[in-house]
Swiss-Prot record:
This is Poly(3-hydroxyalkanoate) polymerase subunit PhaC. Its EC number is 2.3.1.-. InterPro entries: AB_hydrolase_1, AB_hydrolase_fold, DNA_repair_Rad51/TF_NusA_a-hlx, PHA/PHB_synthase, PHA_synth_III_C. It comes from Haloarcula marismortui (strain ATCC 43049 / DSM 3752 / JCM 8966 / VKM B-1809) (Halobacterium marismortui). SUPFAM superfamilies: alpha/beta-Hydrolases, Rad51 N-terminal domain-like. Involved in the production of polyhydroxyalkonic acids (PHAs), which are water-insoluble biopolymers used as intracellular energy reserve material when cells grow under conditions of nutrient limitation. PHAs are composed primarily of 3-hydroxybutyric acid (3HB) and 3-hydroxyvaleric acid (3HV). Required for the production of poly-beta-hydroxybutyrate (PHB) and poly(beta-hydroxybutyrate-co-beta-hydroxyvalerate) (PHBV). The active site is at C162 (charge relay system), D317 (charge relay system), H346 (charge relay system). The keyword Transferase applies. Residues 82-348 form the AB hydrolase-1 domain.
Length: 475
């Protein structure tokens, strides 16, 4: 028999004491709640200084300024070969530059790398017919050419994040001569019952991406956000808010929480046709891994990927499990491949303190060891008038669908008129890559362009006949 029998009077006092403590804690928490909510709303993200050096349709190519960021690197430690970060078409890229001590961009700058990033921005309804070919063989290729031209390198380093990593694989297979090294971060590449919940939900047995696009045009950000959150509903709808309440008095925790919530709620729509292609060809049919993928009739041949390849994976990534990435290294031609599986999740690869202490310095070193540089090359990247910050000014494209057939603005044409005929890149839709191909064929001016029919231009520029016809319709 117990020597301490139950004492109802003492139990009642203990219950009362505990209740008073809880009430006191709740009162103290409520006093700081409004202040903490204001703090969450005032946090800054994406603070590393950058300049927009190229624009096309909605995309902006950012060049980060280490000096303006207060990052001092000795000249002998600066790398000649730049890194182009290719972000996903989903969400905003500032998850890679969330705050100073948790910024992938800053870690690379601190290691002496010259860093660029493609910010796709949000497509309009006019962009719903953009395809993966548009994103990979037009937009990405134009951005790569700008970076090559600015750096004087014939091949650059690429770091692709998530969906941007998958697109970077496509690009590298089609343009291997322009890629020095290929880094992939949480990239979905192999979907043979290896992609976890996302692959199962995206199975053609349960889901038709075409039905979504037929209904909405572009895929709504809200639909995507809810779908991702429901993959781990307890964490996303319960646990994280309990943690927030328990740490409300910790200003640093509240600021970090606010930054993450801002990013999670800052989703963007995805161009409809590209979404359908990605889901059907990459997820449902696994064509990329099987080496069967084609973009606009061009084979995305994995045998062309023979440069150094680095894969970064999160051990606990529920969106892109490591098994959806690892097997890829076995089907490419490169004999210099490496995988790093870090003890974190999908987003943790970008923002966890441990990855910034241990992983990203190692990644920066990997790029440095393989960035010996090359002799300067002269890449013809012509543009309209240069902006004050030496940007490639294509602002007239920013709000125009890539397939639009509107006439070139007459007033702008008159203002820019000179004795020299207008170059072909003044036509909406002809970026540096297409312009270079046309120039090589002796087609330099708009007048030269008008002498050809769409079929011939398509062959010369290595594009579709419909796109070539769009160019002619503007003349």
């Amino acid at each position: 028999m117990s020597s301490n029998p139950f004492n109802p009077f003492e139990a009642a006092l203990n219950w009362q004491r505990k209740t008073l403590e809880n009430m006191t804690d709740a009162a103290e928490t409520s006093q700081v709640a409004d202040e903490r909510l204001e703090l969450m709303e005032s946090v800054d993200v994406g603070q590393t200084p950058s300049n927009v050096v190229y624009e096309e349709n909605k995309l902006e190519l950012l060049h980060y300024d280490a000096e303006a960021a207060g990052i001092e690197v000795p000249d002998e430690e600066k790398e000649d070969v730049p890194i182009l970060i290719v972000y996903a078409l989903i969400n905003r890229p500032y998850i890679l530059d969330l705050q100073e001590e948790r910024s992938v961009v800053r870690r690379l700058l601190e290691a002496g790398h010259d860093v660029y990033l493609i910010d796709w921005n949000e497509p309009s309804r006019l962009d719903q017919h953009l395809t993966l070919d548009d994103y990979v063989n037009r937009y990405m290729d134009n951005c790569v050419d700008v970076v090559r031209d600015r750096s004087g390198q014939d091949a650059i380093n690429i770091l692709g994040y998530c969906m941007g990593g998958t697109m970077s694989v496509m690009y590298t297979a089609l343009h291997k001569e322009k890629v020095n090294t290929l880094g992939l971060m949480a990239a979905g590449l192999c979907f043979d019952h290896t992609g976890g919940v996302l692959e199962e939900w995206g199975s053609e047995e349960y889901y038709s991406p075409q039905d979504v696009v037929d209904t909405f045009g572009n895929v709504p950000a809200d639909m995507l956000d809810i779908g991702f959150a429901l993959m781990d509903p307890v964490e996303n709808y319960v646990t994280k808010y309990i943690r927030f309440a328990e740490n409300m008095e910790n200003e640093g925790f509240v600021e970090n929480f606010g930054r993450m919530e801002q990013w999670l709620g800052d989703g963007i729509d995805v161009a409809g046709e590209a979404y359908v292609q990605f889901l059907e060809d990459v997820y449902q049919d696994n064509k990329l891994y099987k080496n069967e993928l084609e973009l606009d009739g061009k084979h995305v041949d994995l045998d062309n990927i023979d440069m150094p390849v680095l894969q970064l994976m999160g051990e606990y990534d529920h969106l892109i499990p490591p098994e959806a990435s690892k097997p890829f290294n076995d089907v490419i031609a490169s004999d210099d491949t490496r995988t790093i599986e870090f003890s974190t999740g999908h987003i943790g690869l970008s923002v966890s303190s441990s990855t910034h202490a241990d992983l990203w310095p190692e990644v920066a070193e990997w790029y440095s060891e393989r960035s010996t540089g090359s002799e300067e090359v002269d890449i013809e990247v012509e543009s309209p008038e240069a902006a004050e910050d030496d940007a490639v000014d294509q602002s007239e494209l920013t709000d125009i669908d890539v397939d639009a057939t509107d006439d070139v603005d007459a007033d702008a044409t008159e203002d820019d008129a000179t004795d020299e005929p207008a170059d072909v890149d003044s036509v909406s839709g002809i970026g540096p890559t297409y312009a270079e191909r046309l120039h090589d064929a002796g087609i330099h001016s708009v007048a030269d362009l008008a002498e050809y029919d769409a079929a011939d231009l398509a062959d010369i520029a290595e594009t579709t006949e419909s796109r070539a016809q769009d160019w002619l319709d503007q003349l």
